[in-house]
Amino acid sequence: CETVISGKKVLLLKPSTFMNLSGQSVTEAAAFYKVPMDRVVVLFDDISLEPGASRVRRKGTDGGHNGIKNIIYLSGHDDFPRVKIGVGKKPHPDYDLADWVLSGFKKEEVEPMKNAFILAQGAVEQIVAGNIDKAMNLYNGTGRQKAQEKRAARENKAPAAPHPSQPAENAAQENPGESKA
């Protein structure tokens, strides 16, 4: 599907190959459209992140993800941006990984996953606009936010604004005339 993101024409692909063979689709499309790998953005599931968490990376290893491993192997590059979307760990070590990542989400995971897709969209918009550092700062977990809050407390300043993935803790107090509904 061709579309425009951040004012740039982009092509969105969902490989129809098995996930472990994602590199076939990605490298063929990149070659056909003459897109260098550092301009290819890959979104994928990550079992090392909690459901709904996201992480942006400029480049890196496959991290044990066979689809990413195949993209790196067939393209010969690991320097493509990626957005990881957490799906959580298997409930038991004996649970089949393919069954786990293809299963549905628990009721309590649905809202965090919806939020993850919104965050992934924002991250992709920043990456396409050429702002991968900004995407990483905005969308990579809460570690940075907690560090900012600790630093602010030491300096006796107000804490930084909440991370985009975190709900405003005092929304009702900040907007007393508005309800959550």
Task: Cite the ranges covered by each PLM segment.
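N-terminal, polar/charged subdomain of small-to-medium soluble alpha/beta proteins
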Residues: S179-K180
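Short amphipathic alpha-helical coupling segments at ligand-binding clamshell hinges
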Residues: P112-A116
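Short, electropositive alpha-helical surface patch
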Residues: P93-E111
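Hydrophobic alpha-helical segments within soluble ligand-binding/sensing domains
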Residues: G64-G67
